[in-house]
Design a protein with these regions (language model features):
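Short, glycine-/small- and polar/acidic-enriched structural segments
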Residues: 1-59, 84-88, 103-107
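Short glycine-centered helix-capping/turn motifs at secondary-structure transition points
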Residues: 2, 81, 100, 192-193
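Ligand-binding cleft/hinge of the Venus flytrap
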Residues: 46-68, 97-98, 146-151, 191
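A local structural motif
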Residues: 54-69, 73, 80-83, 193-201
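Pocket-lining segment of extracytoplasmic ligand-binding domains
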Residues: 66-152
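Secondary-structure end/capping motifs
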Residues: 121-198
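Conserved C-terminal helix/tail region of periplasmic/extracytoplasmic solute-binding proteins
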Residues: 190-218
């Protein structure tokens, strides 16, 4: 409560990966044992790093660093050789590929969509109708839109960027974020004690907005 509602008629999936310098001794996921990996605290990069590394390392060997800032700051730290490994997504993911950094492990992940508890449901649906149209345009001709990544980046990198090499990034999936997704995700997070003090008591029905679509979904 107080953190918004889960929009249950869509979710998104983002390409993501753990990157290291091209000359790093880290070449396999197993080489990441006890190596600090820069991630965002209680974010997609946090969860996806654990999820992707679990088949390769014990929990005691997974070393997450939360002290390296937000997405672009973490990217800068890797470029400046201030950190050994970073989990990156969106534009920074493609920029690392362009610059020749080594992707050690794919950590692509699914994201729920949160909206304000005060938001009008009709306004939310109009917003997502526009997003659906935009997603279709990107699916059809992504090369027409990758130049917009440049606007997100720190000024120091813009002249280096070749956005013709970039991919579509996060993709919105217009399918229900189901009760199964909700329950499985909560159970996974709870098992790993990621949230101190627990996850709260809200049920799926209490947490979501846009129930009309779900009622018509078998």
């Amino acid at each position: 409560s107080g953190h918004g509602k889960l929009y249950a008629n869509a979710y998104s999936v983002s390409p993501c990966g753990i990157f290291v310098p091209h000359d790093s001794d880290i070449k396999t996921p197993e080489d990441l044992a006890n190596v600090p990996i820069s991630v965002g605290y209680q974010s997609g990069s946090h969860y996806s790093t654990i999820q992707a590394l679990e088949p390769f390392l014990s929990h005691n060997e997974i070393n997450l660093s939360f002290a390296d800032g937000l997405l672009f700051k973490r990217m800068e730290n890797l470029i400046d050789s201030a950190v050994p490994a970073v989990n990156l997504f969106s534009g920074p993911y493609y920029f690392m590929e362009q610059l020749g950094f080594r992707k050690v492990l794919d950590t692509s992940f699914m994201m729920a969509v949160m909206v304000s508890e005060e938001a009008d449901v009709e306004d939310i649906e109009k917003y997502f109708k526009a997003l659906r149209m935009a997603q279709k345009d990107i699916d059809l001709r992504q090369e027409l839109y990758t130049h917009y990544y440049r606007d997100e980046f720190p000024e120091r990198f813009r002249d280096q960027m070749d956005t013709r090499l970039f991919g579509p990034g996060e993709r919105i999936v217009f399918e229900p974020y189901s009760r199964e997704f909700f329950d499985d995700s909560r159970a996974w997070i709870a098992e790993r004690n990621i949230f101190e003090g627990g996850l709260g008591e809200l049920t799926y029905d209490e947490a979501i907005v846009a129930p009309k679509m779900l009622e018509s979904t078998p």
